[in-house]
């Protein structure tokens, strides 16, 4: 998998970081809204 060079590492890190921030944001927002307790 390493050394193929098809997907830049910075692109993976950027997409992964945005996904993590989005999930955390939804979870925190859900906690304040009372939805996070059901998760």
UniProtKB/Swiss-Prot annotation:
Localization terms from the record: Plastid, Chloroplast thylakoid membrane
Keywords tagged on the record: Chloroplast, Membrane, Photosynthesis, Photosystem II, Plastid, Reaction center, Thylakoid, Transmembrane, Transmembrane helix
InterPro entries: PSII_PsbJ, PSII_PsbJ_sf
UniProt KW tRNA-binding keyword: no
Pfam families named among the record's database cross-references: PsbJ (PF01788)
Topology versus the membrane: Single-pass membrane protein
CC per GO annotation: chloroplast thylakoid membrane; photosystem II reaction center
Domain of life per record: Eukaryota
Alphabetical list of Gene3D superfamilies matching this protein: 6.10.250.2070
BP GO annotations: photosynthesis
Ranges that cross the membrane: 9-29
Main location: plastid
Signal peptide (residue range): none
Protein family membership: Belongs to the PsbJ family.
General function of this protein: One of the components of the core complex of photosystem II (PSII). PSII is a light-driven water:plastoquinone oxidoreductase that uses light energy to abstract electrons from H(2)O, generating O(2) and a proton gradient subsequently used for ATP formation. It consists of a core antenna complex that captures photons, and an electron transfer chain that converts photonic excitation into a charge separation.
Summary of subunit composition and partner proteins: PSII is composed of 1 copy each of membrane proteins PsbA, PsbB, PsbC, PsbD, PsbE, PsbF, PsbH, PsbI, PsbJ, PsbK, PsbL, PsbM, PsbT, PsbX, PsbY, PsbZ, Psb30/Ycf12, at least 3 peripheral proteins of the oxygen-evolving complex and a large number of cofactors. It forms dimeric complexes.
Protein name, entry field: Photosystem II reaction center protein J
Encoding gene per record: psbJ
